[in-house]
């Protein structure tokens, strides 16, 4: 029976819920199928009971208290403002809350009375000290503009460069997230002062000790994202580190006094700088994030290279100057001691550039694909890849996108905007990676190389296409030309080539000592038949002038072929000129001409010897 039952196939429609809400909103504006009328200060609002009950616990209790027949059609509400109720109704049908700085308190009071918790949370977050409506809108836009994962190789490089600039904003969003447990209770205003844009630009941001404690409006310690700062805030995995000072004190009196040179004085005394022990203030891009941790933190340790640092670690050291190094072995042992691996957990970390660049980011795991998403607020965008939801629609062609930055790039097709400009030829591009590929034309950089034939390409898709063809891994037959001796011998035959009844021409033994590539007493070459040879004359007689003319034509053919070959190989007149200069030292005939030797004994043909030895370059 189980085999007879077909498997159920679920086909999701991600846009169905939004389309239903849009249809209900159109019915509300048109007054169709509305089953309740809300009256607030003589203003009427026609709506649907089911939508109100789904959004508000107050309306759910009101509409489900009795039977449907006994419930009235008109409800008059006197505890909310008309603007607040209109904004809440718009939120119920469009999932968008439109507020201003003037009516945020009225909307908060109405949401509390109607028991709409999500609106209460948003209004409380906006009304916190240091926040405003404009900053909330900017934060939402920045969250949408941050790229989370790569769709291809080129976009990955572009998004990594953008994340280098936008990472502090992600951390700011993480710190600004409200606690769900404490969201309902009103929070007390912060006691810390607010930074203006001018104060922030004039404030050093690298190290905590760069503040002047006596200056007015002191803001305490600015977080430098070092490991020491993270350990104090429990944001970095803390290892079992023993106490530093007692563990190093036994080594000091026995090891260090005799290792230092006598002329090296003690470290200069630095005055202690009193630090405020208030909560840490995080200032990022003209934004001050309120710390949720109310505990007062201890002041940071003094600078690592101060004399107080060594005094605290080595209390038993004498106050006088240190003695000289006694032997080279002591100096080597001293270096080995300082480079020991176990001291890595004892000495405090130095403020290196790599540690200052360490930026903690919130991480969330996808419940579907179990992928870890780095950055606060990026998990909902990742979930759209599974649900297929595309909330951002183009107003011109109605194409939908999952991310707002993709919609902005798509809108450039309609507006014609090309923000990326080439500095060499003023060419404009829509995408950043298109500009990078274009710049390689000017720079000549080919970063993508084939591992089989070592051919380089400017774009990665060109390399993938080359590898997919597998043209560099196939053994193809050699298509080169025949050797020069074979080409020279082929000119001795007619246009149709040698006939089937070709004879063999034997080189006389006297030519074996002539310079060339052949050695031996006799060499057998394919010879033409008497009827097809160019020396054969139909008249039976041949003059010396005609032989010289035909031989010069043969030399011109050789020169023409060599010229074409040089142009094809070198690809220019300069290479051809160089080839002529090289060819002057080497004749084109590596073999002696057998016909000159064969005709040397004929009467009246003695003047042909100097013509036969003439090379192509001399011609």
From Swiss-Prot:
**Keyword annotations for this protein?**
Metal-binding, Repeat, Tumor suppressor, Zinc, Zinc-finger
Any Pfam family matching the protein? BTB
Which cellular component terms (GO) are annotated to the entry? nucleus
Note the InterPro entries from the entry: ARM-type_fold, BTB/POZ_dom, SKP1/BTB/POZ_sf, Znf_C2H2_sf, Znf_C2H2_type, ZnFinger_BTB_dom_contain
Determine if Metal-binding is one of this entry's keywords. Answer: yes
Keyword Nucleotidyltransferase assigned: no
Give the GO molecular function terms.
zinc ion binding
CDD domains for the chain: BTB_POZ_ZBTB7C_ZBTB36
Give the record's GO biological process terms. Answer: negative regulation of cell population proliferation; positive regulation of fat cell differentiation; positive regulation of transcription by RNA polymerase II
Q: Where is the composition biased (Basic and acidic residues)?
A: 191-208
Q: Where is this region: Disordered?
A: 129-219
Q: Which SUPFAM superfamilies match?
A: ARM repeat (SSF48371), beta-beta-alpha zinc fingers (SSF57667), POZ domain (SSF54695)
Q: Mind telling me what this protein is named?
A: Zinc finger and BTB domain-containing protein 7C
**What task does this protein carry out?**
May be a tumor suppressor gene.
Enumerate the residue ranges forming zinc fingers (C2H2-type): 364-386, 392-414, 420-442, 448-478
Question: What PROSITE patterns does the database record attribute to this sequence?
Answer: BTB (PS50097), ZINC_FINGER_C2H2_1 (PS00028), ZINC_FINGER_C2H2_2 (PS50157)
Listed Acidic residues bias regions: 134-173
By its UniProt entry, which Gene3D superfamilies does this protein fall under? Classic Zinc Finger (3.30.160.60), Potassium Channel Kv1.1, Chain A (3.30.710.10)
Q: Which residues form the BTB domain?
A: 34-101
Where does the sequence pass through the membrane? none
């Amino acid at each position: 029976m189980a085999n007879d039952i077909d498997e159920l196939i679920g086909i999701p429609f991600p846009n169905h819920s939004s389309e239903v809400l849009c249809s209900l909103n159109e019915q509300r504006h048109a007054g169709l199928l509305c089953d309740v009328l809300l009256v607030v200060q003589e203003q009427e609002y026609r709506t649907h009971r089911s939508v109100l009950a789904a959004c508000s616990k107050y309306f759910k209790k009101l509409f489900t208290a009795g039977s449907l027949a006994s419930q009235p059609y008109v409800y008059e509400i006197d505890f909310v403002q008309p603007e607040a109720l209109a904004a809440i109704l718009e939120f119920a049908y469009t999932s968008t809350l439109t507020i201003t700085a003037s009516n945020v308190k009225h909307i908060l009071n109405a949401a509390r009375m109607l028991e709409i918790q999500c609106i209460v949370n948003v209004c409380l977050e906006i009304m916190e000290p240091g926040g405003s409506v404009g900053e909330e809108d900017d934060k939402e836009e920045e969250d949408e503009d941050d790229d989370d994962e790569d769709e291809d190789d080129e976009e990955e490089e572009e998004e990594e460069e953008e994340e280098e600039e936008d990472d502090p904003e992600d951390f700011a969003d993480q710190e600004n997230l409200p606690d769900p447990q404490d969201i309902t209770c009103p929070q007390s205003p912060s006691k810390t002062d607010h930074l203006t844009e001018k104060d922030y630009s004039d404030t050093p941001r690298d190290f905590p000790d760069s503040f002047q404690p006596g200056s007015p409006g002191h803001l305490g310690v600015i977080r430098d994202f070092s490991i020491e700062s993270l350990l104090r805030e429990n944001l970095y995995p803390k290892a079992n580190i023993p106490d530093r000072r007692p563990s190093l004190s036994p080594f000091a009196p026995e090891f260090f006094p005799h290792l230092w040179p006598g002329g090296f004085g003690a470290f200069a005394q630095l005055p202690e700088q009193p630090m405020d022990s208030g909560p840490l203030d995080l200032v990022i891009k003209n934004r001050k994030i309120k710390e949720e941790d109310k505990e007062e933190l201890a002041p940071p340790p003094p600078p690592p290279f101060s004399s107080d640092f060594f005094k605290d670690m080595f209390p038993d050291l004498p106050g006088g100057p240190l003695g000289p190094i006694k032997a080279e072995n002591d100096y080597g042992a001293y270096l080995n001691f300082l480079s020991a691996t176990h001291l890595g957990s004892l000495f405090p970390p130095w403020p290196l550039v790599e540690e200052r660049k360490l930026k903690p980011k919130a991480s969330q795991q996808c419940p579907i694909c179990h992928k870890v998403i780095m950055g606060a607020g990026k998990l909902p965008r990742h979930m759209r890849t599974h649900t297929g939801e595309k909330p951002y629609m183009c107003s011109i062609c109605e194409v939908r996108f999952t991310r707002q930055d993709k919609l902005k790039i798509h809108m450039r097709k309609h507006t014609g905007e090309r923000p990326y400009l080439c500095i060499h030829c003023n060419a404009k591009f829509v995408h950043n990676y298109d500009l990078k590929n274009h710049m390689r034309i000017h720079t000549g950089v080919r970063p993508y190389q084939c591992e089989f034939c070592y051919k380089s390409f400017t774009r990665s898709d060109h390399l993938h296409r080359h590898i997919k063809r597998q043209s560099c891994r196939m053994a193809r037959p050699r298509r080169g030309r025949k050797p020069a001796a074979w080409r020279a011998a082929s000119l001795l035959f007619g246009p149709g080539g040698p006939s089937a009844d070709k004879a063999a021409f034997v080189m006389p033994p006297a030519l074996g000592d002539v310079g060339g590539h052949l050695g031996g007493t006799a060499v057998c070459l394919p010879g033409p038949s008497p009827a097809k040879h160019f020396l054969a004359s139909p008249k039976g007689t041949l003059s010396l002038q005609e032989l010289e003319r035909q031989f010069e034509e043969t030399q011109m053919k050789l020169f023409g072929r060599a010229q074409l070959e040089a142009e094809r190989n070198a690809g220019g007149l300069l290479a051809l000129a160089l080839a002529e200069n090289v060819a002057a030292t080497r004749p084109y005939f590596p073999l002696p001409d057998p016909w000159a030797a064969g005709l040397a004994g004929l009467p009246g043909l003695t003047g042909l010897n100097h013509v036969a030895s003439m090379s192509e370059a001399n011609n």
